[in-house]
Amino acid sequence: MGGIRPRVDTRSKILTLAAALELRPPVAIVSGYFDVLRAEDARELGRVRHHPLLVVVLPVADEILPPLARAEMVAALRVVDYVVIANYGGLDRLVEALKPVEYTRMEGEHAVRRDRWHQQLMEHVDRRHIN
């Protein structure tokens, strides 16, 4: 059995937009809402792990978790090197400045999945209140 690993404060992976714009290529960028972070997200982020990985947490209407909480959860994943909370304008600036070797947008998938998850959650709550 290995020794005890030191705790790492993964919040240090969370950068300001200005700091993220100073990153050196090559870098991969993945953007999304990550509200709620799911296993599929972790698998997708692991798939693009061939270069330093910058994840951009975007705003979403009717959020379940605030942006900082979502950024902290994403930063806790071992495959993620950096996280930035940004709006779409900030995302565009990052893509233009960093010219990522890989760029994956997950927000469309997140929106569909979030709506489905929200519906399932509401149905579950309704069933629990009936019984």
Segments from the language model and where they lie:
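Nucleotidyltransferase catalytic core that binds NTPs
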Residues: 1-131
